[in-house]
Amino acid sequence: MKNYGVKMLREQMENIPDIPFPEGFGIRNYRPGEGHIWTRIQRAAEPFIKMDDGLFEREFGHHLEVMPDRSFFVITDDGEEIGTITAWWNPDWKGVEWGLIHWVAIHPDYQGRGLSKPAMTVAMKRLKRSHDRCFLNTSTQRIVAIKVYLDFGFYPYLEAENSQEAWTAVASVLAHPILKACGF
């Protein structure tokens, strides 16, 4: 399958799934100076994007003061950081402010253990405190992630270039009621 960049929307913040972490795992807030931890996790987990040392600063450096409130690390009971998710925002997308689920990653050694949905619960609840709607960016080869996002009530954004082709490809390998409701 060709790897298209896609956007997904959630136009309201009600009925956020409340998924607890499995035994042995939890979540904590980012602490100042922990960009290197974020980078380590992203490098380990990211198959498509080159993670250079300056990425964290480019993505978050202009708003480091809000990171402890908006960025989270999935941790083991021993305190090892093995995942990350950020409840960010875009001040002017489509003419209004939107919350943004941003840079979700679970270290490959811990993928498949049911950690993404609990992390999404935490980030979505944080977004709900400040935003009436949210979106995220992902790509079509991240089928497991797309299923998580669909399960959290995100819909395909269909106004982007190649969106019909992209979501048709996703629907060819992932059956989901939201995709069906969107005509795929």
What do these predicted ranges mean?
Residues 30, 104-106, 138:
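Hydrophobic adenine-recognition pocket in adenosine-nucleotide-binding enzymes
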Residues 127-138:
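Conserved GNAT acetyl-CoA-binding A-motif
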Residues 136-146, 162-169:
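Conserved beta-strand-loop-alpha-helix junction that forms the acyl-donor binding cleft
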Residues 26-38:
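A short beta-loop-alpha structural element at the N-terminal edge
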Residues 43-106:
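A conserved beta-strand-loop-helix scaffold within acyl/acetyltransferase catalytic domains
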Residues 150-159:
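Conserved acetyl-CoA-binding loop of GNAT-fold acetyltransferases
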Residues 103-108, 112-128, 147-151:
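Conserved acetyl-CoA-binding loop-helix of GNAT-fold acetyltransferases
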Residues 1-23:
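Acyl-donor-binding surface of acyltransferase catalytic domains
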